[in-house]
UniProtKB/Swiss-Prot annotation:
Its main location: host cell. Accepts ubiquitin from the E1 complex and catalyzes its covalent attachment to other proteins. Performs the second step in the ubiquitination reaction that targets specifically a protein for degradation via the proteasome. By controlling the ubiquitination status of specific host proteins, the virus may target them to degradation and thereby optimize the viral replication. May be implicated in the shutoff of protein synthesis through its interactions with components of the host translation machinery. It comes from African swine fever virus (isolate Tick/South Africa/Pretoriuskop Pr4/1996). Interacts with host 40S ribosomal protein RPS23. Interacts with host translation initiation factor EIF4E. Interacts with host E3 ubiquitin ligase CUL4B. Interacts with host RNF138. Pathway: Protein modification; protein ubiquitination. Belongs to the ubiquitin-conjugating enzyme family. The lineage of its organism: Viruses, Varidnaviria, Bamfordvirae, Nucleocytoviricota, Pokkesviricetes. Pfam families: UQ_con. This is Ubiquitin-conjugating enzyme E2.
Amino acid sequence: MVSRFLMAEYRHLTENPSENFKVSVNENNMTEWDVILKGPADTLYEGGLFKAKIGFPPNYPYEPPRLTFTSEMWHPNIYSDGRVCISILHGDNAEEQGMTWSPVQKIDTILLSVISLLNEPNTDSPANVDAAKSYRRFVHKEDLESYPMEVKRTVKKSLDECSPEDIEYFKNAASNVPPIPSDAYEDESEEMEDDTYILTYDDEDEEEEEDEEMDDE
């Protein structure tokens, strides 16, 4: 069952590529994916190509996957071992903690959420305390050099660890491939609802016209 879900999602991502990330599957294990996330434009992470792995549990999609960066990261919500602390990937006691994982979440939504997190960290519950402290000093203009310097170091390191093929992929994607919007699935559902309304409305109009014709007769 897990493989069926993952095959469908992987097919969707390969048929609708994004300039923001690249995914590949472990041929020997469908539940392990390799990912490269592109640092968001106009942020300290711009230009970085950060590698990560996604691991899917046996009961996916009813339990969230795990995303772990293999590239070195300097961020308040990323542990030193690369694990990401973000609500969308929390499963245990999610309802009690106000977390947002649900089986309808898609992989592209997860990846775009992680990319967004890079520039919008949550310092209230940091995974990396030192990075959180440095980020706060940066935001409050107490130290404008330390945090950016560490981030830019990881950006450079991520590029050094990327293959020329991966770098070329993102260069081409930036000019040829539109990004996948994070609300793509919501838009599709809204369109379906609109179409249903139009059909229902037209049917009612036809019934009213028929009634009027009968009255005239």
